[in-house]
Amino acid sequence: MAAYCQAQGLDVVLAALLGAINQQPSRQQFQQQQQQQRQPQLQQQQQQQGIQQQPQGLQHQQQQFGLTQQHGQGRRQNIVQPNPASQNNNRMMLDMLLLNQIAQSNRMNTLAFIMAN
């Protein structure tokens, strides 16, 4: 692929693609990032709805001694994190650009071949 891109004069696109590939996290890292981002969102939603997570054993002890759960409004600071979906979109755009360039050069090669014969 790299040799083909260089032969077609697509060094800039190749460099951009290689940069995107080098920055691309592994599938496991990406899933961990998504999980880490979902967890605070889930906790935030639960706090806004007045739901608090407690281990099952503690809940049972509270019921045994006649204690009730307190539902309070949780306050949480909003932390802005980069959206991994936008990074994926950028990679997809680079892939589309490269494919477009390859298709265009193939058309030009086909045209030159037809003209030569």
Curated annotation (Swiss-Prot):
The keyword Secreted applies. Disulfide bonds: none annotated. Transmembrane segments: none annotated. Residues 27-88 are annotated as: Disordered. It is found in: Secreted. Residues 27-72 have a biased composition (Low complexity). Component of the acid-soluble and acid-insoluble organic matrix of calcified shell layers (at protein level). Residues 75-87 have a biased composition (Polar residues). Keywords: Secreted. GO terms for cellular component: extracellular region. Its main location: secreted. This is Glutamine-rich protein. It comes from Haliotis asinina.
